[in-house]
C-alpha cells in the first residue's frame, strides 16, 4: 500500500521496514560525477561539501535536509552519481565553487518510492542494499533508476558507527 509522505520523508523517523511512499520532487544542489572510481567516493564527498556549504550561502539558499548521493546507473568499478543537499528553492544556474567544482541545480525525484533505513556503519551498506532490493521485489514492486542514499546521521570522527542512519531509496517503475 502506498502512503503519501506527510512531511519531508527524509526527516521522518527511521523506516524499520520497507515502506512505499508517494513523494514530491525536492530541489537540490549537487556536484554530478560520471565514471568516477568507486575508490575515490570519499574524496568526491569531501570536495563537494567543502565547496557546497559556502556556495549555498553566497546564492542565498538554505539546506532543508541531510546530504545524499543519487545514482543514475548501477555502480561497477565506477559510479555515475550526484552528491549534494536538498535546498529551500531551486538554484537558478550552475555555479563554479571552491576548487573549481561545478554545482548544478537538480532534484530528488518525485513519484512512488520504496525506502528503508540502514542503522549501522557504512561498511554494511552493500548488504543492506541487497536485502532492501530483495524485499522490494518480494513485495511485488519493480525498482527503477535512480536510487539514492540519504545520510541522515552526519558522520564525524567521534560518531559511533552503530548509531549511524542511512536511508536507502529507490524509485519504483
Report residues per predicted region.
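A solvent-exposed interaction/effector surface
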Residues: 1-173
Amino acid at each position: 500500500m502506498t502512503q503519501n509522505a506527510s512531511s519531508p520523508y527524509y526527516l521522518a523517523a527511521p523506516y524499520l521496514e520497507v515502506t512505499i511512499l508517494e513523494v514530491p520532487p525536492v530541489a537540490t544542489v549537487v556536484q554530478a560525477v560520471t565514471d568516477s572510481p568507486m575508490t575515490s567516493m570519499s574524496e568526491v564527498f569531501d570536495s563537494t561539501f567543502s565547496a557546497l556549504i559556502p556556495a549555498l550561502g553566497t546564492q542565498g539558499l538554505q539546506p532543508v535536509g541531510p546530504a545524499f548521493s543519487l545514482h543514475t546507473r548501477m555502480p561497477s568499478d565506477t559510479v555515475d552519481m550526484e552528491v549534494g543537499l536538498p535546498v529551500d528553492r531551486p538554484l537558478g544556474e550552475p555555479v563554479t565553487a571552491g576548487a573549481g567544482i561545478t554545482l548544478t541545480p537538480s532534484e530528488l525525484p518525485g513519484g512512488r518510492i520504496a525506502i528503508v533505513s540502514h542503522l549501522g556503519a557504512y561498511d554494511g551498506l552493500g548488504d543492506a542494499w541487497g536485502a532492501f532490493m530483495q524485499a522490494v521485489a518480494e513485495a511485488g514492486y519493480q525498482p527503477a533508476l535512480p536510487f539514492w542514499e540519504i545520510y541522515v546521521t552526519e558522520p564525524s570522527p567521534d560518531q559511533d558507527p552503530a548509531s549511524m542512519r542511512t536511508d536507502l531509496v529507490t524509485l519504483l517503475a
